[in-house]
Amino acid sequence: MSVFDKVKSIVVDQLGVEEDEITLETTFADLNADSLDIVELIMALEEEFDLDIPDEDAEKIRNVGDAVNYIKENQ
């Protein structure tokens, strides 16, 4: 499973959206995620990929592509 597919699966689980709504360009705001949703999403990504994402980096992750790129660069 690719990083994108794993991230997409986590977004679907965390935000309760349909998988076909998610592309690399999809922002979390597009999916009606509030700040708490985003914190929980970042925590789920950290757990899945065994990463520690500092707050200053988490603030830069605004869409699915940002998350995928961050994970690929820091794994």
Swiss-Prot record:
Its main location: cytoplasm. The keyword Transport does not apply. GO terms for cellular component: cytosol; membrane. GO terms for molecular function: acyl binding; acyl carrier activity; phosphopantetheine binding. 4'-phosphopantetheine is transferred from CoA to a specific serine of apo-ACP by AcpS. This modification is essential for activity because fatty acids are bound in thioester linkage to the sulfhydryl of the prosthetic group. InterPro entries: ACP, ACP-like_sf, PKS_PP-bd, PP-bd_ACP, Ppantetheine_attach_site. The keyword Lipid metabolism applies. Pfam families: PP-binding. Residues 1-75 form the Carrier domain. The modification O-(pantetheine 4'-phosphoryl)serine is found at residue 35. One of its GO terms (biological process) is lipid A biosynthetic process. Keywords: Cytoplasm, Fatty acid biosynthesis, Fatty acid metabolism, Lipid biosynthesis, Lipid metabolism, Phosphopantetheine, Phosphoprotein. Pathway: Lipid metabolism; fatty acid biosynthesis. It is found in: Cytoplasm. HAMAP family: Acyl_carrier (MF_01217). Belongs to the acyl carrier protein (ACP) family. PANTHER family: ACYL CARRIER PROTEIN, CARRIER DOMAIN-CONTAINING PROTEIN. Carrier of the growing fatty acid chain in fatty acid biosynthesis. This is Acyl carrier protein. It comes from Desulfitobacterium hafniense (strain Y51).
